[in-house]
């Protein structure tokens, strides 16, 4: 059907409710808007659904959510694991509770029990819940740190990680096979509860989750000793982190935790924020104001679904607060865990740290220093979760920590996704340890630069919206793949990795080897002296990202090098 035919189908079919029809009637004469809403189905990709909330096939609404859930249900039934049930969580966004309820009732209508949280919860707690309940799958209704007009739907599998190949592709096939909305099943909540197929969960899972987090503390005595001396400012950015973060810090004994009042409670409009992303310095405006007022040691922000953590720490020499990238905060926690586990004799046999190919190269000297195996996986925390499962199945290694550059990490194996609640807890322990030794987190970071090298990373993003955007992004990748640059400025490309074609080319000798990772549309350029550049189209947005990293002789030298590399990459493009 053409997009106008699709519009008329939605307007005239009794399946769609009047509220949906009224929304469409209001835009029916705006052809560009009609086209954008109906020119395609909202794509159920490897990460699930993500899109603008509204009526239409290319929007997040009860009908697209129901259809996605029917596809998931069909796949679960084909595998014969429907008796295990599915756990469901949701964030603070508009329509998140409604979409979660819609998914639960669709599952119930297919004979699959839904365990749905009573109110909003962090994404990592969903990962923990489905493992604890022994579910076959999990759903989180969230659009993470996207603007308020968005929502999304992520699917997790029985190990607690987001679905990976081949399961992700098989679920996509099932969703795409549904051509008629009328074939999608649903039932009332009342009937689902009577049938024992709709169960609300909450406190019991919360308590178990908290107990599991506390197992990651290495020096509880240090926290007790410094609990009255350290000042923490925290903002949940109007999302799910408020209650769990406050609870864990309170139960550990931290006495001075100041929560940003304007961003404390859930707000689907994110009124005080341009963009609820802890990677964005503007997200810290209110928190930094409070930090200066309270003379805080550390300033923390979790994103709306509490899987990413942003950090500022005080530089006592200047009195200013320094922003930490995800690489920096991840390295602080990694160094602390590896150093203290080694010192206390609690490092497991065959320890491994798992990271992604676009994360800082500082992971290499740190893991070498402590005799820990470094394993690199494709971008996306689900691949770190997949490694934990592999370790458990084979006994090859013991997981000690995992991190990615995009402000996500995981200490422990209680969840299989990045967990900002455990990250807050770990970082506050590190801050307490530093305070005991008359240091700040920034002092510790500087000492790590002096020990391992001045590593610095950045990103350059090209956004291409609309129908032509995907084509233009494909053309850029095609050009780089077929004619890889010999150099970026004065940095020669030493090795070129094409993950889609599973080949690594030594640019000098021409020798070819394999990447050793699953196929993915990613290009990686190895440059001299720990410099690198990686090109990767986003899986959820009309963007192509260029990740870059360098190693300098000082903080200033590293900054200058990364700025020059960014300009050289732009020149090649």
Residue ranges and their predicted role:
Residues 156-186, 327-351, 355-366, 420, ...:
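Glycine-rich phosphate-binding loop plus the immediately following alpha-helix
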Residues 99-107, 150-157, 307-327, 363:
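Short Gly/Thr/Asp-enriched flexible loops that form oxyanion-binding sites at enzyme active sites
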Residues 85-91, 231-234, 410, 549:
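Short glycine-rich or small-residue beta-strand-to-loop segments that form or flank ligand, phosphate
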Residues 292, 296-298, 320-322, 340-536, ...:
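Phosphate-binding and adjacent anionic-ligand microenvironments
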Residues 38-58, 143-144, 232, 236-248, ...:
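Conserved phosphate/anionic-ligand binding catalytic regions in large, soluble enzymes, centered on
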Residues 33-38, 42, 151-285, 291:
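Gly/Ser/Thr-enriched, mixed-charge loops and adjacent short helices
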Residues 87-150, 255-310:
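N-terminal small/polar loop signature for handling phosphorylated ligands or for N-terminal nucleophile
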Residues 5-103, 192-229, 240:
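An N-terminal, well-structured beta->alpha segment
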């Amino acid at each position: 059907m053409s997009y106008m035919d699709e519009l008329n189908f939605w307007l005239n079919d009794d399946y769609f409710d009047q509220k949906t029809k009224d929304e469409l009637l209001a835009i029916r004469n705006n052809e560009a808007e009609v086209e954008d809403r109906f020119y395609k189905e909202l794509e159920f990709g490897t990460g699930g659904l993500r899109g603008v909330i509204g009526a239409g096939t290319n929007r997040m609404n009860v009908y697209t959510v129901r259809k996605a859930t029917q596809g998931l249900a069909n796949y679960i039934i084909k595998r014969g694991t429907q008796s295990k049930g599915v756990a469901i969580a949701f964030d603070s966004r508009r329509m998140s509770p409604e979409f979660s309820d819609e998914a639960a009732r669709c599952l119930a209508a297919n004979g699959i029990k839904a365990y749905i949280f009573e109110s909003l919860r962090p994404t990592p707690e969903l990962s923990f819940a489905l493992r604890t309940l022994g579910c076959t799958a999990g759903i989180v209704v969230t659009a993470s740190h996207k603007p308020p007009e968005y929502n999304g739907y992520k699917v997790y599998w029985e190990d607690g990680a987001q679905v990976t190949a081949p399961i992700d592709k098989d679920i996509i096939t099932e969703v795409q096979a549904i051509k008629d909305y009328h074939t999608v099943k649903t039932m009332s909540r009342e009937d689902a509860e009577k049938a024992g197929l709709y169960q609300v969960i909450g406190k019991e899972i919360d308590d178990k989750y908290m107990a599991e987090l506390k197992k990651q503390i290495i020096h509880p005595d240090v926290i007790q000793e410094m609990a009255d001396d350290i000042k923490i400012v925290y903002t949940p950015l109007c999302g799910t982190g408020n209650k769990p973060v406050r609870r864990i810090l309170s139960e550990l004994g931290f006495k001075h935790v100041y929560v940003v009042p304007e961003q404390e409670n859930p707000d689907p409009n994110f009124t005080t924020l341009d963009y609820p992303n802890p990677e964005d310095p503007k997200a810290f405006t209110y928190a930094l104001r409070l930090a200066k007022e309270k003379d805080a040691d550390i300033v923390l922000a979790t994103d709306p679904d509490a899987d990413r953590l942003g950090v500022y720490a005080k530089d006592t020499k200047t009195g200013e607060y320094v922003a930490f990238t995800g690489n920096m905060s991840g390295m602080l926690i990694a160094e602390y865990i590896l150093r203290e586990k080694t010192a206390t004799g609690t490092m497991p046999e065959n320890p491994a740290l798992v990271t992604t190919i676009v994360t800082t190269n500082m992971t290499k000297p740190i893991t070498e220093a402590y005799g820990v195996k470094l394993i690199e996986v494709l971008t996306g925390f689900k691949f770190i979760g997949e490694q934990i499962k592999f370790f458990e199945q084979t006994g090859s290694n013991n997981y000690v920590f995992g991190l990615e550059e995009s402000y996500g990490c995981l200490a422990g194996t209680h969840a299989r996704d990045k967990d900002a609640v455990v990250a807050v807890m770990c970082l506050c322990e590190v801050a307490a340890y530093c305070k005991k030794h008359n240091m700040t987190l920034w002092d510790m970071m500087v000492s790590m630069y002096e020990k391992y090298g001045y590593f610095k990373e950045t990103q350059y993003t090209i956004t291409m919206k609309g129908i032509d955007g995907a084509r233009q992004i494909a053309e850029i990748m095609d050009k780089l793949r077929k004619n890889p640059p010999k150099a970026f400025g004065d940095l020669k490309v030493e090795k070129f990795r094409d993950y889609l074609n599973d080949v690594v080319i030594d640019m000098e000798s021409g020798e070819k080897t394999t990447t050793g990772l699953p196929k993915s549309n990613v290009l990686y350029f190895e440059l001299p002296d720990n410099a690198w550049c990686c090109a990767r189209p986003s899986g959820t947005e009309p963007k192509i990202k260029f990740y870059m990293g360098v190693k300098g002789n000082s903080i200033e030298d590293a900054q200058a090098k990364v700025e020059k590399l960014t300009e050289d990459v732009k020149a090649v493009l």
